[in-house]
Amino acid sequence: MLATRALSLIGKRAISTSVCLRAHGSVVKSEDYALPSYVDRRDYPLPDVAHVKLLSASQKALKEKEKADWSSLSRDEKVQLYRIQFNESFAEMNKGTNEWKTVVGLAMFFIGFTALVLIWEKSYVYGPIPHTFDRDWVAMQTKRMLDMKVNPIQGFSAKWDYNKNEWKK
């Protein structure tokens, strides 16, 4: 009996299509993304809805005045009508931001931090450079490889002239 009651409650909860959801003891409206929304974007210049959804009394009067001849509207009234419909103008949208300074600053910070880590590693983590990197050692190793005639067809020894004891030109 208890199991059927629990399953019926779970089923009702899962099937219900209410708009309100309960969260932390209060009712929260879920956002319906199927409805048109306002966005300021250069590539989408005319949004589906106006910027201001709930008009004040003065804005409603201005909207009524808009229905008449536009030559009777002052410049400020036209700007107010524009601001009811749009949040930003194209000039305001195209205006550069200072975000690039933050990006460049953070990139330089991380590059500098990485350089400090590399300097610290070179000083304290890595040992001395091996003796096999010394020029004399490399010369002796090269001479040994030439004496052994390593890869004589296309490789290292093919570029050495054994008669003249010099590199081929």
From Swiss-Prot:
Residues found modified as Phosphoserine: S56, S58
Similarity annotation: Belongs to the cytochrome c oxidase IV family.
Modified residues annotated as N6-acetyllysine in this record: K29, K53, K60, K67
Main location per the UniProt record: mitochondrion
Ranges per topology, Mitochondrial intermembrane: 125-169
Residue intervals on the Mitochondrial matrix side: 23-98
Record protein name field: Cytochrome c oxidase subunit 4 isoform 1, mitochondrial
Keywords for this protein: Acetylation, Membrane, Mitochondrion, Mitochondrion inner membrane, Phosphoprotein, Transit peptide, Transmembrane, Transmembrane helix
GO biological process: mitochondrial electron transport, cytochrome c to oxygen; response to nutrient
TM segment ranges: 99-124
Free-text function comment from the UniProt entry: Component of the cytochrome c oxidase, the last enzyme in the mitochondrial electron transport chain which drives oxidative phosphorylation. The respiratory chain contains 3 multisubunit complexes succinate dehydrogenase (complex II, CII), ubiquinol-cytochrome c oxidoreductase (cytochrome b-c1 complex, complex III, CIII) and cytochrome c oxidase (complex IV, CIV), that cooperate to transfer electrons derived from NADH and succinate to molecular oxygen, creating an electrochemical gradient over the inner membrane that drives transmembrane transport and the ATP synthase.
UniProt subunit comment: Component of the cytochrome c oxidase (complex IV, CIV), a multisubunit enzyme composed of 14 subunits. The complex is composed of a catalytic core of 3 subunits MT-CO1, MT-CO2 and MT-CO3, encoded in the mitochondrial DNA, and 11 supernumerary subunits COX4I, COX5A, COX5B, COX6A, COX6B, COX6C, COX7A, COX7B, COX7C, COX8 and NDUFA4, which are encoded in the nuclear genome.
GO cellular component: cytosol; mitochondrial inner membrane; mitochondrial membrane; mitochondrion; nucleoplasm; respiratory chain complex IV
Organism: Rattus norvegicus (Rat)
Endpoints of the signal sequence: none
Membrane topology classification: Single-pass membrane protein
Residues where N6-succinyllysine is found: K29, K60
Pathway in which the depicted protein is active: Energy metabolism; oxidative phosphorylation
InterPro entries: Cyt_c_oxidase_su4, Cyt_c_oxidase_su4_fam, Cyt_c_oxidase_su4_sf
Subcellular location: Mitochondrion inner membrane
Transit peptide stretch: 1-22
